[in-house]
A protein has these predicted regions:
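Sec-dependent N-terminal signal peptides
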Residues: 1-8
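Extracytosolic ligand-binding ectodomains
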Residues: 5, 20-365
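Sec/Tat signal peptide C-region and signal peptidase I cleavage site
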Residues: 13-20
Length: 365
């Protein structure tokens, strides 16, 4: 009997998910290489954890479930090519990603044009709202984030601040939006500098904002370039004033702990309530460490919601899945809290958190 059971397992016949070719598939385009690779790998882990949970719970449509992950390389052309492969070769009904708004937006436009469902899990530009009828958004966008961060900065006692942000769709939205909200509160922006990404040094920009003698520096930056900015700010003596990061975990994802220590900031909420805690515990158990960024929970929710929508649709037809996802999105208990979409497929009341970097990690304050 033991021998025959061994044969069954060897042949892959002892499980209901014997043939990978029969898997129900969805896609993900993540930044696994390039300046945001740390975030991309963190999110990939969450995607795999979600895939494993779906399969442990019986799969989708009675079949195994698989998320095909492609690398954007942090480049919009590469991301669109990856999405094209997922659509034309793999025939997936849903693609999640990317990370940077400057990449997610053109990729989302392509997916909507092809009639494939796109789920935004990390990009915060308000332009995400305009992607079209098959695009869904799980995360808080800049307008809501700017209100939260400006009020938080005001409550911390900052009155005259300098802003440093990347010169792209995301950075422009943060800089201009924060200015508008902060000035409504009575605050003053003494300098606004938008930097070019990918430079080997940012000393010129840092010296420029330092000359205006702000109460605090408000900034946002992607992982590897942020590490350069934070190191050079320390070397130039700019850490004598508070540094406040919009999206703290992103801005510090590649910065050494001794340099990041003491920074303040805000973030999209990463996990909420008992469901969120169970997810965080499962993540730590599988990967022997906690999440490095706050975006993993959104990817996890997106994968589980997609699996639920495909089951509800009874089909992998993109139009059917889109309709089912709207229904799932009327009230889903996710790890990032309750997910409910408005008529424009945007999340209602997304979570935010007030944070600081202390003892080698991002913690609540």
């Amino acid at each position: 009997m033991l021998t025959s059971m061994s044969v069954l397992f060897t042949l892959g016949l002892a499980t209901p998910f014997a043939h990978a070719a029969d898997a129900v598939q969805m896609g993900a385009v993540l930044s696994l290489t390039g300046p945001n690779a740390t975030v991309g790998e963190d999110v990939r882990r969450a995607v795999k954890l979600a895939e494993d949970k779906v399969n442990a719970d019986g799969g989708v449509l009675g079949k195994p479930f698989k998320v095909i992950v492609e690398d954007s390389g942090g480049n919009p052309t590469t991301a669109i090519n990856a999405a094209r492969k997922l659509v034309s070769v793999d025939k997936v009904p849903v693609v999640i990603g990317e990370y940077s708004s400057g990449i997610s937006i053109p990729m989302g436009q392509y997916l909507v044009k092809e009639g494939v469902v796109h789920i935004n899990i990390a990009s915060t530009s308000v332009k995400v709202r305009d992607l079209g009828s098959s695009s869904f958004n799980l995360i808080g966008l800049e307008d809501k984030g700017n209100k939260f961060s400006s009020q938080d900065a005001w409550d911390l006692g900052f009155r005259n601040v300098a802003i440093l942000a990347p010169n792209n769709a995301y950075g422009q939205g943060v800089a201009h939006g924060f200015r508008a909200e902060f000035e409504k509160l009575g605050g003053k922006i003494v300098n606004e500098t938008l930097y070019t990404a990918g430079q080997s040094t940012y000393r010129r920009e840092l010296q420029q904002i330092a000359r205006t003698k702000p109460d605090a520096y408000i900034y946002t930056a992607y992982g590897q370039e942020s590490a350069v900015i934070n190191r050079e700010a320390l070397e130039l003596g700019l850490r004598d004033k508070p540094w406040y990061a919009i999206l703290l975990s992103m801005s510090l994802s590649d910065t050494p702990a001794n340099i990041a220590q003491g920074q303040l900031g805000m973030e999209v909420g990463s996990f909420v309530g008992p469901t969120g805690k169970a997810y965080a515990d499962a993540f730590a158990a599988k990967y022997k460490e906690g999440m490095k960024t706050s975006y993993t929970g959104y990817a996890y929710d997106a994968v589980l919601m997609t699996a639920k929508a495909i089951d509800k649709a009874g089909s992998t037809d993109p139009a059917a899945v889109q309709a089912a996802l709207k229904d799932v999105g009327k009230g889903y208990d996710g790890v990032t809290g309750k997910v409910a979409f408005d008529d424009g497929r945007q999340r209602i009341d997304p979570p935010y958190a007030k944070l600081k970097y202390d003892g080698g990690k991002v913690v609540p304050r």
